[in-house]
Amino acid sequence: MNAHKERLESNLLELLQEALASLNDSELNSLSVTKVECSKGKHHAYVFVLSSDHKILSKLKKAEGLIRQFVLQASGWFKCPKLSFVSDNSLEKQLRLDAIFNEIAKGKDND
């Protein structure tokens, strides 16, 4: 990954967290953005949030225009990527892997 793309994703992550905190909806402004992945042309960004609730993801989709407007004003950029909000399930995967490794470790200890 090139440095420019990493910088863009990092800046966008910070701006999105600020944008969510500025919203009037208590469910949205308490969300955590865990990761941002921009497309190669930087016209589209996947925003990973810690929520598996489809209702929250739907609210985020409705608020996309306000969030993009905030990002544009705060950054001074000419254009903001289109945002797609995605549930981040990496924590759940990590917990499952930890449980599997613990089972393996218990099995080796019993041998």
Swiss-Prot record:
Record keyword Cytoplasm present: yes
Pfam families to which the protein is assigned, alphabetical: RBFA (PF02033)
Tagged with keyword Cytoplasm: yes
Single GO cellular component term: cytoplasm
Chief location category: cytoplasm
Subcellular localization(s) per the UniProt record: Cytoplasm
Annotated signal sequence range: none
GO biological process: maturation of SSU-rRNA
Record keywords: Cytoplasm, Ribosome biogenesis
Family designation: Belongs to the RbfA family.
Subunit comment: Monomer. Binds 30S ribosomal subunits, but not 50S ribosomal subunits or 70S ribosomes.
HAMAP family in alphabetical order: RbfA
Function: One of several proteins that assist in the late maturation steps of the functional core of the 30S ribosomal subunit. Associates with free 30S ribosomal subunits (but not with 30S subunits that are part of 70S ribosomes or polysomes). Required for efficient processing of 16S rRNA. May interact with the 5'-terminal helix region of 16S rRNA.
Protein name from the UniProt record: Ribosome-binding factor A
Species name: Helicobacter pylori (strain ATCC 700392 / 26695)
Lineage: Bacteria, Pseudomonadati, Campylobacterota, Epsilonproteobacteria, Campylobacterales
